[in-house]
Regions:
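Gly/Ser-rich helix-loop-strand patches that form or flank binding pockets
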Residues: 81-131, 219-273
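N-terminal beta1-alpha1-beta2 submodule of the flavodoxin-like/Rossmannoid cofactor-binding fold
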Residues: 55, 63
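Charged docking surfaces used in two-component/phosphorelay signaling
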Residues: 72-79, 205-211
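Short, well-ordered secondary-structure micro-motifs
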Residues: 48, 105-106, 135, 151-152, ...
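Rossmann-fold cofactor-recognition segment
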Residues: 67-70, 202-203
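A conditional alpha-helix N-cap/helix-loop micro-motif detector
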Residues: 17, 74, 104, 148, ...
């Protein structure tokens, strides 16, 4: 019997941590995956209470016919999530965040380091619950970077499970050289989606205040998932601040699938690991 793929869920037992568990629960049914709960403690004396809380959560999952296990890790959550993901051979990490303000306060600059240090894709969620129908509407910001093609491919692969419509949103760039590079990524998306019978749309947004306009459009479309590449060499970097951080902590509380550069350059594929 083949071993089920693992979804790793770091939890801190807060409402947003509970939201991550809820998302993972729904995804585990769709992807036929096992859930691995993780709680990291800095002091050994905190381990027994954490272990007890995790065992209670496992009991709730098992009542719902979800295969689950858990463990307590000594260390630092920012450094150890990637290590645990490797050890458990996790194929997806579902993690909660408290939004941009909370993320800056609680996690600071290390928030994206958690993702950057792992070759496993993350789905970062806030308190907003996952819809029963799942990720029916997926949105992707497109710039000139070649890794965006992998983001489009990931969106298509996960979207297959939900018969999703995919919305491509690109930057309207006045510089002809950059504009040509951005436009080069559009035909790839069209060909991939059309060949596989996926409904899609393509929309351009002015470069000025792209991040906030992108989030506003995502909310207007009632998006269920945003897909991005965690790449500091993209056009979005020049908009000021961290584009990735703004999207991850978006005010509409839309979940974000984040693929880092390590994964985007590897052979990782949802199709390979989740069928």
């Amino acid at each position: 019997m083949m071993k089920k793929p693992v979804i790793l869920v770091p939890t801190d037992f807060t409402p947003v941590g509970d939201s991550a568990v809820a998302y993972a629960t729904q995804l585990s049914k769709i992807l036929d995956a096992k859930i691995e709960l993780l709680h990291v403690v800095a002091k050994e004396k905190d381990a027994p209470m954490a272990k007890s809380a995790l065992e209670a959560e496992i009991g709730r999952l098992e009542k719902r016919q979800i295969e689950a296990s858990a463990h307590v890790e000594m260390g630092n959550i920012f450094d150890d999530i990637g290590k645990v993901a490797d050890r458990q051979e996790a194929r997806l990490i579902v993690m909660g965040t408290h939004g941009v303000k909370g993320m800056q306060h609680v996690m600071g600059s290390k928030a994206l380091k958690v993702i950057t240090n792992s070759d496993v894709p993350f789905i970062v969620v806030q308190k907003k619950p996952m819809k029963e129908a799942g990720f029916k509407t997926i949105i992707i910001p497109v710039d000139f970077n070649q890794e965006v093609k992998q983001s489009i491919k990931y969106a298509w692969e996960i979207g297959k499970y939900f018969d999703a419509k995919i919305h491509i949103v690109y930057v309207k760039e006045k510089d002809p050289f950059i504009a040509a590079k951005i436009e080069h990524n559009i035909p790839y998306a069209q060909e991939l989606l059309e060949e596989n019978g996926v409904a899609y749309s393509i929309t351009g947004i002015d470069k000025k205040d792209f991040a906030n306009e992108f989030i506003d459009l995502s909310a207007k479309l009632d998006a269920d998932l945003i897909t991005i590449i965690n790449n500091h060499e993209n056009i979005f970097t020049y908009f000021g601040g961290s584009f990735e951080q703004t999207i991850i902590g978006n005010k509409a509380e839309i979940p974000v699938l984040v693929i880092n550069q390590i994964a985007s350059k590897s052979a990782y594929s949802f199709s390979i690991y989740f069928g």
